[in-house]
């Protein structure tokens, strides 16, 4: 499905679910017959006989998805399970069709977490260290740079090298399916958790910085692959059903464009 199609489907599910619920509450004695004439989805059903719209949407989004073609499988390997609630992890990974990941691993470390480590080592205030580090990392995405210029940014990228490579690999996969997991106390579509979507902005920021470092060091092909990966990831994320997923997709695509311009303006890039 296209982003527009998925968004329309999600809106239909949300409105359909709300309408059905309103009807039930306004006239609890009136039972609606579940059929294609009354609702797009006719199954699965909840114990009370209502259509389980979240499960229906999840089934639709997961059609044809396997652990081998799903970008989310590699993205979770890159970022780790930390943003997935502990009580939801078994269900999340079961729906992905892969074993659950351990809490601790060689996962991508974000800018703030890395800056906090620097502050702890130096004894400086974390706010001062993080502000300077964020500025350097942002500049490192805007132009070619050397390891001597931004040595701490280079060290973070080196530490995250394998995780970033997983993000690149994920971008090459043709499908994007992140299981719809809801809070049991609030089983509504609006309460579906999005544990992987926001983390991709962190991955793209670091990939664009790595691309500019590769460009400065003469690896124009590797730099271009990192940038293309950002755009491919945005396309994959656009398959997400939610408005948040669509907005993050637009944001990471836009983040990569600035680095694209720096790449194309560089003397290291030739017509060949």
Mark where each language-model region is.
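N-terminal Sec-pathway targeting helices
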Residues: 1-11
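Hydrophobic alpha-helical membrane-insertion segments, chiefly the h-region
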Residues: 10-21
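Aromatic-rich surface patch/π-platform used for binding flat ligands and interfaces
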Residues: 20-272
């Amino acid at each position: 499905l296209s982003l527009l199609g998925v968004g329309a489907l999600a809106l239909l599910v949300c409105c359909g679910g709300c309408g059905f619920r309103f009807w039930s509450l306004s006239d609890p004695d009136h039972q609606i017959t579940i059929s294609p004439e009354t609702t797009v989805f006719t199954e699965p059903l909840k114990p009370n006989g209502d259509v389980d719209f979240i499960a229906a949407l999840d089934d639709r989004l997961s059609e044809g998805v396997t652990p081998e073609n799903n970008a989310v499988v590699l993205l979770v390997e890159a970022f780790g399970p930390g943003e997935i609630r502990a009580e939801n992890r078994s269900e999340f990974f079961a729906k992905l069709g892969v074993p659950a990941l351990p809490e601790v691993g060689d996962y991508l470390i974000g800018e703030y977490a890395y800056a906090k480590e620097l502050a702890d080592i130096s004894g400086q205030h974390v706010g001062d260290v993080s502000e300077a580090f964020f500025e350097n990392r942002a500049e490192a995405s805007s132009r070619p740079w050397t390891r001597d210029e931004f040595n701490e940014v280079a060290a973070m990228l080196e530490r995250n090298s394998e995780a970033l490579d997983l993000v690149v690999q994920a971008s090459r996969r043709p499908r994007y399916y992140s299981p719809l997991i809801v809070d049991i106390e609030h089983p509504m579509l609006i309460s579906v958790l999005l544990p992987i979507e926001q983390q991709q902005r962190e991955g793209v920021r670091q990939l664009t910085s790595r691309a500019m470092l590769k460009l400065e060091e003469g690896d124009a092909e590797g730099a271009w692959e990192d940038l293309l990966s950002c755009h491919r990831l945005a396309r994959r994320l656009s398959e997400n059903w939610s408005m948040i997923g669509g907005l993050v997709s637009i944001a990471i695509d836009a983040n990569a464009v600035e680095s694209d311009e720096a790449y194309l303006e560089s003397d290291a890039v030739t017509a060949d």
